[in-house]
Regions:
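Non-catalytic C-terminal accessory region of glycerolipid acyltransferases
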Residues: 20-141
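Conserved nucleotide-cofactor-binding alpha/beta core module
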Residues: 1-33
C-alpha cells in the first residue's frame, strides 16, 4: 500500500520524505523550498502534545512548529474543499507563537474544515490511536 501511495504522491510533487526523514525537510526548508506536511497524523506520543481535537485531548505532533523554530520558515495552513464542483483553496499563515499555541490553532483550523465538509476528510488514518488506544478502532472494521 505504501508503494501505491508514494507513487501517487511522486506524480504530483518533486520529492517525498517519510516521517523518519525530518532532516530532509530541514535541508529543503533551509534552501527556501516549500514543503507540504500533513500534521493531523498520529505518530505516537514521543513528539506530540495533548491538544483538544473535537473536545478530545488528542496526541498531536508538533513537528511543524519544531521545523519553524529550527529553520525560521513560515507555517501556512492549507485548507482545500470542493464547492459546486470547483476546488477551493484557502491559505492562512500560522503566527510564530509557542509550540502549544500554534498546534492548538492548527487543530482548530482542521476542526473547522472537517465541520464544513466532513466527507472530504481522510478518516481512515486512526487519528485517535495514541489517545484512545488501538482497541478503539477494533469495532470500526
Amino acid at each position: 500500500m505504501h508503494k501505491i501511495i508514494d507513487s501517487g504522491r511522486k506524480r504530483a510533487v518533486k520529492d517525498t520524505a517519510t516521517k523518519k526523514e525530518t532532516l530532509r525537510f530541514i535541508k529543503w526548508l533551509k534552501k527556501g523550498k516549500n514543503v507540504l506536511y500533513a500534521i493531523d497524523q498520529d505518530y505516537g506520543i514521543k513528539h506530540s502534545k495533548k491538544i483538544n481535537f473535537f473536545g478530545i485531548p488528542t496526541y498531536t505532533i508538533t513537528t511543524a512548529e519544531r521545523l519553524q523554530e529550527i529553520t525560521n520558515c513560515n507555517v501556512v495552513f492549507l485548507d482545500s474543499w470542493f464547492e459546486e464542483g470547483v476546488l477551493r483553496i484557502n491559505l492562512e499563515e500560522i503566527s510564530k507563537n509557542n509550540v502549544i499555541a500554534s498546534t492548538e490553532m492548527i487543530s482548530q483550523r482542521i476542526e473547522s474544515s472537517i465541520r464544513r465538509n466532513p466527507g472530504e476528510y481522510l478518516w481512515h488514518h486512526k487519528r485517535f490511536k495514541s489517545s484512545l488506544g488501538k482497541e478503539f478502532y477494533k469495532d470500526a472494521r
